[in-house]
Amino acid sequence: MKVTLIAILTCAAVLALHTTAAEELEAESQLMEVGMPDTELAAVDEERLFECSVSCEIEKEGNKDCKKKKCKGGWECKFNMCVKV
C-alpha cells in the first residue's frame, strides 16, 4: 500500500514539474517571436544564403545568366549568396 502511494505521489510530482517546464518553454518561444536572439538570426541568414544559392543554381542552366533572386529585408543576391545591403 505504501509503495503504491509513493508511486502515485512521485508520478504527480513529475507531472507537475513537466507541466511547469512546458509552460516555461512556451513562454520563451513567444518571447523569441517578438525579438529574435542572435542564434535565431544566424539561422535565418543561413536560410537566405541557402535559398539564394540554390535558386541561382537551378536558374543557371546552359549559357543563361542566373537571375538574381530578390532577397527581402535589406538582403541582395550577389555571387550566388545573399548579402546584407
UniProtKB/Swiss-Prot annotation:
Disulfide bonds join C52-C66, C56-C77, C71-C82. Expressed by the venom gland. Keywords: Disulfide bond, Neurotoxin, Postsynaptic neurotoxin, Secreted, Signal, Toxin. Pfam families: Toxin_20. Residues 1-22 form the signal peptide. Its main location: secreted. It is found in: Secreted. The keyword Signal applies. The keyword Oxidoreductase does not apply. Residues 23-48 form a propeptide. It comes from the Eukaryota. One of its GO terms (molecular function) is toxin activity. One of its GO terms (cellular component) is extracellular region. Postsynaptic neurotoxin. Belongs to the neurotoxin 12 (Hwtx-2) family. 02 (Hwtx-2) subfamily. This is U4-theraphotoxin-Hhn1w. It comes from Cyriopagopus hainanus. The lineage of its organism: Eukaryota, Metazoa, Ecdysozoa, Arthropoda, Chelicerata.
